[in-house]
Amino acid sequence: MNILVVNAGSSSLKSSLFLTVEGRVEATPIWQAQVDFTYKPGEALIQTRRRGGGWEPFPSASPEGGIGQLAPLFQSLWQGEGSLLPQAAEIGGVGHRVVHGGSLYRQPTLITPEVERAIEQLIPLAPAHNPAALAGIRLLRQLLPGIPQVAVFDTAFHQQMPLAAALYPLPYAWAEQGIRRYGFHGINHEHCARRAAEILNRPLEELRLITCHLGNGCSLAAIRGGRSVDTTMGYTPLEGLMMGSRSGSVDPGILIHQLRQGMSVDELDRILNRESGLKGVSGLSSDMRVVLEAMEAGHARAELAFELFVHRLRSQIGAMLMSLDRLDALVFSGGIGENSAPVRAAACADLGFLGIQIDPVLNAGSPRNCDISTSDAPVRVLVISAQEDWAIATACQNLLQGE
């Protein structure tokens, strides 16, 4: 059986096809696709690749048509010359990443009309992402009628946080209206926790972990016994750490001040989400690689952006530690977490008093799914590849098999 994964965002789409062998999902997909709807005015960039091959162009689409026009991309899996599958029925299930499931969904869920309506009702909490997920769900239902579809929610992993971690110190009536901390990146935080247990060869139930998902979006999670007990993102993915173009947490009084100065709500939203973070401070880019290159060339604001990013990261690592009774491992994942040795080194600098000490040689050696601590460090530091699509496929497979 094959599992198709669809990860639809506001301006992009990623998809993977995984083969299952003896009930287990293979780690490497046999087919991948990526769509960038912002590639050029009036043109989307579509690329596909098969296992072992490179990316190849697929006939372009118009950005205005959105996800609904991507039927030929998915149909190419079972139709036409060179198709991978003899028929559409070879796909046994479709797994969708859904960013926001609110407090309703704590685990992967078979998509029914009721679930679809709930995802639609949650659009105000994820206006950039839930509509894209719905478009993907509806397109694949049209292309693969009768094939079960599963929603895997980015918020689900955090829904068992203690109320003290989940609620804001605001009027309780607001919490009753659903204004609370939901957390995000849960699919990868949970994957990292399970993978850490494998690397450390210890039962997940006994581990105390802090997982750092650092990419264009960034969040941390404190994980005790495989369960999230705290996280840095909240009601929206805007809370918490400094990110690529998002501000992270700021004094709400600043926002009130700007509104009183005449800034519109839409403009404030745009600045906080798209013009802040690394991009806003450096004045250069939301890409940490660009910031590091500029810093090495002596760019003062790039250096400031890096230092601010690291300061806030270290501060929140400390905050996550307070939700645990000890720390067994600190885990780095995501585009920055996996690929930026300078960020890992700076984040862990002078933390020997906590038992954290990384080996500079191991840290600099492009580590993947391994331990980069010194041999005698009480707390292990791991680098784990984010494999959200595989995690979604596995969750889909387990649900369909009744595990």
Swiss-Prot record:
Protein name: Acetate kinase
Job description of the protein: Catalyzes the formation of acetyl phosphate from acetate and ATP. Can also catalyze the reverse reaction.
One Pfam family from the record: Acetate_kinase
Record InterPro entries: Ac/propionate_kinase (IPR004372), Aliphatic_acid_kin_short-chain (IPR000890), Aliphatic_acid_kinase_CS (IPR023865), ATPase_NBD (IPR043129)
Residues annotated as the enzyme's active site: 154 (proton donor/acceptor)
Binding, ATP: 14, 213-217, 287-289, 335-339
Listed pathway(s): Metabolic intermediate biosynthesis; acetyl-CoA biosynthesis; acetyl-CoA from acetate: step 1/2
Catalytic reaction list: acetate + ATP = acetyl phosphate + ADP
Catalytic class of the enzyme: transferase
Major site of localization recorded for this protein: cytoplasm
GO MF term set: acetate kinase activity; ATP binding; magnesium ion binding
Assembly and interaction partners: Homodimer.
Natural source organism: Synechococcus sp. (strain JA-2-3B'a(2-13))
Keyword Transmembrane: no
Gene encoding the protein: ackA
Site feature Transition state stabilizer, where: 185, 246
Residues that hold substrate according to the record: 97
Keyword terms, alphabetized: ATP-binding, Cytoplasm, Kinase, Magnesium, Metal-binding, Nucleotide-binding, Transferase
Cofactor entry: Mg(2+); Mn(2+)
UniProt cofactor note: Mg(2+). Can also accept Mn(2+).
